[in-house]
């Protein structure tokens, strides 16, 4: 909404969707729309410098008749002119600082959501830093490559939404640590509240160890068992506990030097522990262990909170005044129980550190993905904060969940793996338009070749190994199937990494055989056996089951003739393999009109957004050719 006011009297310009703009001047242009604009209009016959205004930062104009002064009150930061700070991300659970190895983008380059902008060296490895908060341009690199010891959340670059804003963003940039000079209305002094009673007991130097994030999608975990007991010595790399993640039961290795386990804060068998919630205490000297016998997380938290309030009594009030979050409590999202929450790693880390429930935060990223900015702008309701604090303090005393039984039924609590599997499969069926193609393949030649190879090799090759290899060859011939759907583009993968579904007592796992098109049958067979054994024992590492470009599910060994599998998101296809059966078929031999044949039935489930029906049929045609002529797989 854009209007020019040429009268001397005061005017009020009102936008239906934005704030009010109050005018009392001559020849004033006022705007409350959604895009920024530049004005050089005259205010009371005084030429002003060009200035950019947006609906997000213009709250009021006024020109008091007594002083003829144009006053601008800014209450929100405008990224169109100042840019957005990008901070050092936390790319691993124990990371406190990192190094910029190399910048993948240079100043002025365009950046799209998902682009890798830098290589960051963490305390574990060198990893890609993907920018996930929308599109923009890299205005300024604040930390040059090669810099080491950069603390988490320290600004490293400036991003702007428009290329023409780069110059002004660099010129006007001030580090976030420097408070802006925005005038803030003072509040009447509040009556001083009595500080909570502090703990007077002091403890020797110690380290509070929190629940680690052992998989990218992990939000809570469970302590299956402690492999160390109180008083035991711990060396770097020792497994101190078995942790149940949303994917598997994994060893929690302590890697921050040597010490002694002074206190276990969460007993074995406890589930639903938030990431970074304290689980144990480590000390350097064994004689200090006994001093933590009565250590209490709640007592220490109360003491820390009290100390913080005494040192900065006005910080909370000023913070609440300065921030103008876009999400009010009435606008907060309520998600269904079990619904999958999409959030960036930075957002999960920030929410975890603040104790926020991600299900209550509105996501503004692609597909409603929760971004770090959404977490920073989120203001929880008082009731939610109280519930979160109560939940965190009671988790350590929560007893392990056990099945409850009555005369007519038994209630078995959901494991983390079962919850995640349910959410993922529901998401797949609700968001991916499935269709199914079935084809029968004659596998007599394959079975004969398998017998000959197994007679010569120590590695025993299975029919499933041939299917994995044939699938990779068909993906190489039909690369459209080796893709995934996003709202902005279809991503086609150059690598062929195949997930092989494995059923375990803990639930369904899909470990990955990577680079299948480059492996031989012996290598594929060895990899599948090793991964399946790890899955059965709950020892899979996240890198062995996260991602993948195509999935195979084989129920043939259970006598299933044919079935249709659910696509493993974000992949675009999954192959369901049934059992083989012997049939009588027409023969091409002149001496016999009939012969027996071994037939294998397979069904390809496809994402119709990515794979058209004809493309899926071509893939199955290629797959059938490789299965019926397996010599092609070893050439």
Swiss-Prot record:
InterPro entries referenced in this protein's UniProt entry, alphabetically: 2-oxoacid_DH_actylTfrase, Biotin_lipoyl, CAT-like_dom_sf, E2/Pdx1, E3-bd_dom_sf, LAT1, PSBD, Single_hybrid_motif
Cofactor note: Binds 2 lipoyl cofactors covalently.
GO biological process: pyruvate decarboxylation to acetyl-CoA
Listed Basic and acidic residues bias regions: 187-197
SUPFAM superfamilies according to UniProt: CoA-dependent acyltransferases, Peripheral subunit-binding domain of 2-oxo acid dehydrogenase complex, Single hybrid motif
Family that this chain belongs to: Belongs to the 2-oxoacid dehydrogenase family.
Function field: The pyruvate dehydrogenase complex catalyzes the overall conversion of pyruvate to acetyl-CoA and CO(2). It contains multiple copies of three enzymatic components: pyruvate dehydrogenase (E1), dihydrolipoamide acetyltransferase (E2) and lipoamide dehydrogenase (E3).
Name of this protein: Dihydrolipoyllysine-residue acetyltransferase component of pyruvate dehydrogenase complex, mitochondrial
Native source organism of the sequence: Dictyostelium discoideum (Social amoeba)
Gene: pdhC
């Amino acid at each position: 909404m854009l209007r020019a006011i040429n009268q001397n009297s005061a005017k009020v310009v009102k936008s239906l969707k934005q704030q009010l703009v109050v005018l009392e001047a001559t020849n004033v242009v006022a705007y409350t729309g959604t895009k920024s604009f530049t004005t050089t209009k005259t205010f009371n016959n005084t030429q002003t410098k060009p200035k950019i205004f947006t609906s997000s930062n213009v709250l009021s104009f006024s020109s008091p008749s007594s002083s003829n002064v144009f006053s601008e009150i800014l209450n929100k930061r405008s990224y169109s002119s100042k840019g957005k700070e990008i901070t050092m991300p936390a790319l691993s659970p124990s990371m406190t600082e990192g190094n910029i190895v190399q910048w993948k983008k240079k100043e002025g380059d365009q950046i799209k959501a998902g682009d890798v902008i830098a290589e960051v060296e963490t305390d574990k490895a060198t990893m890609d830093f993907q920018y996930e908060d929308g599109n923009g341009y890299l205005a300024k690199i604040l930390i040059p490559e090669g810099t080491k010891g950069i603390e988490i959340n320290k600004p490293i670059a400036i991003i702007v939404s428009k290329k023409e804003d780069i110059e002004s963003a660099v010129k006007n940039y001030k580090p976030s640590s420097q408070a802006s000079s925005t005038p803030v209305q003072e509040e009447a002094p509040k009556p001083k509240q009595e500080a909570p009673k502090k703990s007077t007991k002091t403890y020797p130097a110690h380290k509070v160890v929190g629940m680690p994030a052992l998989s990218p999608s992990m939000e809570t975990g469970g302590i299956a068992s402690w492999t160390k007991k109180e008083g035991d010595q711990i060396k770097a790399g020792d497994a101190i506990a078995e942790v149940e993640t949303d994917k598997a039961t994994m060893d929690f290795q302590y890697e921050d030097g040597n010490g002694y386990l002074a206190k276990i804060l969460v007993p074995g068998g406890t589930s639903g522990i938030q990431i970074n919630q304290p689980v144990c205490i480590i000390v350097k000297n064994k004689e200090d262990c006994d001093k933590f016998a009565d250590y209490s997380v709640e007592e220490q938290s109360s003491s820390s909170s009290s100390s913080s309030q005494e040192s900065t009594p006005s910080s909370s009030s000023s913070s609440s005044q300065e921030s103008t979050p876009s999400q009010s409590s009435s606008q907060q999202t309520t998600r269904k129980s079990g619904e999958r929450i999409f959030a960036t790693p930075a957002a999960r880390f920030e929410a975890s550190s603040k104790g926020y429930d991600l299900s209550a935060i509105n996501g503004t990223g692609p597909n409603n993905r929760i971004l770090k900015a959404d977490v920073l702008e989120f203001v929880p309701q008082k009731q939610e904060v109280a519930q979160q604090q109560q939940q965190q303090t009671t988790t350590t005393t929560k007893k392990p969940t056990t099945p409850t039984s009555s005369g007519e039924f038994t209630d078995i609590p959901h494991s983390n793996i079962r919850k995640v599997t349910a959410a993922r499969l529901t998401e797949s069926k609700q968001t991916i338009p499935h269709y199914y193609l079935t084809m029968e393949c004659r596998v007599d030649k394959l079975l004969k070749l398998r017998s000959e190879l197994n007679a010569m090799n120590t590695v025993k090759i299975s029919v499933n190994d041939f299917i994995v290899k044939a699938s990779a060859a068909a993906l190489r011939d039909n690369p459209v199937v080796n893709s995934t759907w996003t709202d902005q583009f279809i991503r086609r993968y150059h690598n062929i990494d195949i997930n092989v579904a494995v059923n375990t007592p803990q639930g369904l796992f899909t470990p990955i055989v990577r680079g299948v098109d480059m492996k031989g049958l012996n290598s594929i067979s060895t990899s599948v056996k090793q991964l399946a054994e790890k899955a059965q024992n709950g020892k899979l590492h996240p890198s062995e089951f996260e991602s993948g470009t195509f999935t195979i599910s084989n129920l043939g060994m259970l006598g299933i003739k044919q079935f249709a599998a659910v696509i493993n998101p974000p992949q675009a296809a999954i192959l369901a393999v049934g059992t083989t059966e012997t049939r009588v078929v027409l023969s091409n031999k002149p001496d016999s009109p009939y012969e027996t044949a071994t037939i294998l039935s397979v069904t390809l489930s496809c994402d119709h957004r990515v794979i058209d029906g004809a493309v899926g049929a071509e893939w199955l045609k290629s797959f059938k050719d490789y299965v019926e002529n397996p010599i092609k797989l070893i050439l």
